[in-house]
C-alpha cells in the first residue's frame, strides 16, 4: 500500500510555558508523514526553499519517507510560522506567518504519487485540494481544513469535502462549517455533503468518530459513533502538529491494513491516531516522534485500549 499527503513543509518557531525553539522542522505534511511512516509507505508533496537542507531531508528519509515529491524552489524560502502558547495549550497564538514558496504552490503529482492507494489533503486552500484530488484516483481519501477557509472560501471547501471519504477537523470547525451546535448533528450534516466518515478532533479531550454504513442515508439511525479520550500525560511541552500526527496515525494505519475500512479498523485507527498525537506533544516539534520506536507505539496503544474498556456487568437492582 502507499499513501500520498499534500500540505505544508515548513520551519516553525514556537514558545510555550515549558520552553522554546527557533526554526525547527514542522508543517502539516511533515508531522503527518512521520506518524504515518510507522504503518505504510508515505510520500509527502509540497514545496520548500533553499533553506531546506540535507539535514531535513535526511531526517525524513531515516523514517522511510519518500522525499521525491518535495520540490525545492531555487532562490525561495520555505514556509515559516512563529507562534506561542500560554498555559491553555489548546489555543495557539500566531505571531508571524511567511508563506514563502508556498504562496505560489501549484501541486503537480508524480506518477507514483498519483497511484497512491490513500490520499490525505492537509490544511491548504480548498481549490488546491480539489486540484490534487482530481489528479489522484486513491480508493480512500481524507481532508483537513481550518476556520480561515470556512470564513473566506466556504463554497470551495464544501465542494472539496464532497470529493473525499473522510473529513478530519476540530470540533469548533465542524460546528462553524455546518452551523450546528450539536456535534452529532454537525457530523450528520457533513456526511450529507458526501464523506462516509467524520473525525472531530477535540485536543486534549481526544477525538470522536462518526460513520455511516455503506449504502445508507445520512440519518441518525444509520450512524455509528465512537470516541476516545486523549492519552493522559503528565508532561506536555508543545502541541504544535498534534492534529497532523493524529491524522498520520489514523490514515497510516488504515492504509497499512490494505484500506479495509470496516468499523473495527476505523476504531483501531482512532487509537493509533490518539497514540501518535500523544507522543507528538511530549517534546517540541518533531523531536519525540522522529526518534520513536514502533514498540513504544504498540505499548501505548495497548495501555489506551485497557483504560477505555470495561465489562458489561448488569447493575444491581433495588
Please state what every model-predicted region is.
Residues 118-188, 205-206, 212:
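Conserved beta-alpha-beta core of the PfkB/ribokinase-like small-molecule kinase fold
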Amino acid at each position: 500500500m502507499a499513501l500520498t499527503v499534500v500540505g505544508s513543509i515548513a520551519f516553525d518557531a514556537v514558545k510555550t510555558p515549558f520552553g522554546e525553539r527557533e526554526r525547527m522542522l514542522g508543517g502539516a505534511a511533515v508531522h503527518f508523514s512521520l506518524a504515518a511512516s510507522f504503518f505504510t509507505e508515505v510520500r509527502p508533496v509540497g514545496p520548500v526553499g533553499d533553506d531546506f537542507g540535507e539535514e531535513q531531508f535526511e531526517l525524513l528519509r531515516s523514517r522511510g519517507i519518500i522525499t521525491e515529491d518535495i520540490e525545492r524552489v531555487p532562490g525561495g524560502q520555505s514556509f515559516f510560522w512563529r507562534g506561542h502558547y500560554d498555559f491553555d495549550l489548546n489555543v495557539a497564538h500566531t505571531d508571524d506567518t511567511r508563506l514563502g514558496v508556498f504562496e505560489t504552490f501549484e501541486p503537480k503529482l508524480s506518477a507514483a504519487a498519483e497511484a497512491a492507494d490513500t490520499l490525505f489533503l492537509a490544511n491548504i486552500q480548498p481549490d488546491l485540494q480539489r486540484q490534487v484530488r482530481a489528479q489522484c484516483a486513491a480508493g480512500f481519501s481524507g481532508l483537513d481544513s481550518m476556520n480561515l477557509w470556512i470564513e473566506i472560501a466556504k463554497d470551495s471547501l464544501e465542494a472539496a469535502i464532497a470529493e473525499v471519504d473522510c473529513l478530519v477537523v476540530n470540533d469548533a470547525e465542524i460546528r462553524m462549517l455546518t452551523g450546528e451546535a450539536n456535534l452529532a448533528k454537525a457530523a450528520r450534516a457533513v456526511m450529507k455533503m458526501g464523506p462516509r466518515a467524520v473525525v472531530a478532533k477535540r485536543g486534549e479531550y481526544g477525538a470522536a468518530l462518526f460513520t455511516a454504513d455503506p449504502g445508507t442515508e445520512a440519518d441518525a439511525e444509520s450512524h455509528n459513533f465512537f470516541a476516545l479520550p486523549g492519552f493522559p500525560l503528565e508532561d506536555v511541552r508543545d502541541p504544535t502538529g498534534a492534529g497532523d500526527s493524529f491524522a498520520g496515525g489514523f490514515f497510516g494505519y488504515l492504509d497499512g491494513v490494505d484500506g479495509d475500512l470496516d468499523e473495527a479498523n476505523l476504531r483501531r485507527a482512532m487509537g493509533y491516531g490518539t497514540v501518535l498525537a500523544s507522543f507528538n506533544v511530549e517534546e517540541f516539534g518533531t523531536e519525540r516522534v522522529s526518534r520513536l520506536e514502533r514498540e513504544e507505539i504498540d505499548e501505548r496503544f495497548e495501555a489506551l485500549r485497557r483504560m477505555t474498556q470495561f465489562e458489561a456487568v448488569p447493575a444491581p437492582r433495588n
